């Protein structure tokens, strides 16, 4: 199948003299100031669950807290639960190693750890009773978030940590 281009076709726009000059200028600036081509200075790392029901809420939460496009993202079943629960012990090293390299490469200052309501990984880690007992669900997730916070304080003491439990509507209950 062929595609014929006409002069106004946007898929293969011709580069004008002005466009060529802009491209050359951008290249010259990058060559003159290589730091501009390096990593951006990220502020945080978001650690949350693989559940697609919380993806949009997580992005919205980070943007609302001033982190839009300023954070790295570690996604694992259960989020912080996956990093600390004994049921997922085989995963722990992967998370802590990833946090260390994120600090090294991105110079982050903070970790945001979000669990969420009705989390299958939380049920695996702490029992099916969490499905029907919201108080128990809150207690177990809060305990996991405090363990997560303590683990970060031990391994990366310069980092700040924010933790919370996200409802499926995107609202977050802060856990200190």
Give residue ranges: language-model regions.
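Solvent-exposed alpha-helices and their adjacent loops that cap or buttress functional pockets
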Residues: 36-40, 65-66, 104, 154-156
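Short, conserved "active-site rim" segments that organize catalytic pockets and cofactor/ligand binding
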Residues: 23-24, 38-92, 166-172
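N-terminal secretory signal peptides and thylakoid transit peptides that target proteins
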Residues: 4-27
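Short, flexible loop segments at boundaries between secondary-structure elements
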Residues: 139-149
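MPN/JAMM (Mov34/JAB) isopeptidase/deubiquitinase module and associated MPN-bearing subunits/adaptors
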Residues: 4-10, 154, 160-176
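A structural motif corresponding to the C-terminal end of an alpha-helix
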Residues: 105-106, 148-161
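Short HxH-centered metal-ligating active-site micro-motif
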Residues: 2-3, 69-132, 137
């Amino acid at each position: 199948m062929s595609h014929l281009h006409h002069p106004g076709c946007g898929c293969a726009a011709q580069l004008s003299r002005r466009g060529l000059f802009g491209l050359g200028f951008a290249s010259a600036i990058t060559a003159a100031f290589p730091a501009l081509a390096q990593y951006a200075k990220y502020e945080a790392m978001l650690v949350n669950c693989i559940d697609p029901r919380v993806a949009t809420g997580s992005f919205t939460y980070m943007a609302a807290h001033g982190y839009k496009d300023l954070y790295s993202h570690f996604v694992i079943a259960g989020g912080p639960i996956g990093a600390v629960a004994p049921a997922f012990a085989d995963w722990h090293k992967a998370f802590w190693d990833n946090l260390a390299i994120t600090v090294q490469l991105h110079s982050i200052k903070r970790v945001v750890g979000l669990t969420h309501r009705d989390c299958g990984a939380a049920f695996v880690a702490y029992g099916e009773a969490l499905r029907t007992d919201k108080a128990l669900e809150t207690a177990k997730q809060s305990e996991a978030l405090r363990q997560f916070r303590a683990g970060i304080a031990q391994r990366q003491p310069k980092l700040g940590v924010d933790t919370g439990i996200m409802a499926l509507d995107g609202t977050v209950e802060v856990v200190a």
